[in-house]
């Protein structure tokens, strides 16, 4: 009687090939996740700036984009606020939150590193500067530049 089946060598070779394909797919999947997270953060920043410009025109006075929380790190999100002239306190208009553990986001502006002033007059100057996104895992760096007219460019 003849016994059929795979030999140990054939089984080990098939498992090694399967492991190689699995490693290749996991690296590709990790890269895809990193790219999607980067694009989501950049698009969120662009959307926040566009929404802020519209709200400033609608409200008729300058408003501010501030980091979410009390620090100068924008990694947790940003807050759109206006200054109440009667109470001299900032009031929340809208907030954006993102949970990005691998990205560090900082704002380097001309007049301030902890706020962006959004003008209510479209052709009047507003804060300009750069959002610098640094990936802690891959050391990737993305720069989102905001010019004085509110246009956004990604480098």
Located regions from the model:
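N-terminal single-pass transmembrane signal-anchor helix
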Residues: 1-29
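Short amphipathic alpha-helical/adjacent loop interface patches that line ligand
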Residues: 15, 42, 49
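N-terminal helix-rich module
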Residues: 24-39, 47, 54, 58, ...
